[in-house]
UniProtKB/Swiss-Prot annotation:
A Pfam family that the UniProt record links to this protein: Fe-S_biosyn
Protein name: Fe/S biogenesis protein NfuA
Binding site for [4Fe-4S] cluster: 151, 154
Its biological purpose: Involved in iron-sulfur cluster biogenesis. Binds a 4Fe-4S cluster, can transfer this cluster to apoproteins, and thereby intervenes in the maturation of Fe/S proteins. Could also act as a scaffold/chaperone for damaged Fe/S proteins.
NCBIfam families cross-referenced by the UniProt entry: PRK11190.1, YhgI_GntY
């Protein structure tokens, strides 16, 4: 069973919209290009005739959400909210597993660390046009990473590595990882963030 969370405010928002649609219309939550860096999540109306036999129906208090078979694993832990602030109201859809399928807790260490980097570290670095890739984990439990994009040549990369990435990964993989080291040659250039 998928664990998509639709907050109360989002359910109320959808219920208002659905009240203006033909009876029996619900919503569909989907991922286009799931499991890729170009993955995008969306929500659309789902009239009764659009429900497919292999869809999963997620029942909520005010509506049902239908998810196609392909999108389902990529929407694990997704959160749909309707937030209002001084700038107005907007629907937010956070799907941490849309670009990469969640790995099992007993998966090999490399896969679990790679998943953590892709879903937790890289989204933070993306704001600066950067990313990090896991190259290997050696016999001493040292994760070797390589920075790319705007991180390459950035003067803050050592701080990012030690205070951000290493700290986060060592807590998450306590007893399995001993350190995180940088393989990247940092040549400053026009692509560098700082």
């Amino acid at each position: 069973m998928s664990s998509i969370n639709i907050t109360e405010s989002a359910q109320e928002h959808f219920a208002k919209l659905l009240a203006q649609q033909p009876e029996g219309t619900n919503i569909r939550v989907f991922v286009v290009n799931p499991g890729t860096q170009n993955a995008e999540c969306g929500v659309s109306y789902c009239p009764p005739e659009a429900v497919e036999a292999n869809d999963t129906e997620l029942k909520f208090e005010k509506l049902s959400a239908y998810v196609d078979e392909l999108s389902l694993p990529f929407l694990e832990d997704a959160d749909i909210d309707y937030v209002t602030d001084k700038m107005g109201s907007q629907l937010t859809l956070k799907a941490p597993n849309a670009k990469m399928r969640k790995v099992a807790d007993d998966a090999p260490l490399f896969e679990r660390v790679e998943y953590a980097i892709q879903t937790q570290v890289n989204p933070q670095l993306a704001g600066h046009g950067g990313h990090v890739s896991l190259m290997e984990i050696n016999d001493e439990g040292v994760a070797i990473v390589q920075f790319g994009g705007g991180c390459n040549g950035c003067s803050m990369v050592d701080v990012t590595l030690k205070e951000g990435i290493e700290k986060e990964l060592l807590v998450q993989f306590e007893g399995e990882l001993t350190a995180v080291k940088d393989l990247t040659e940092h040549d400053r250039g026009e692509h560098s963030y700082y």
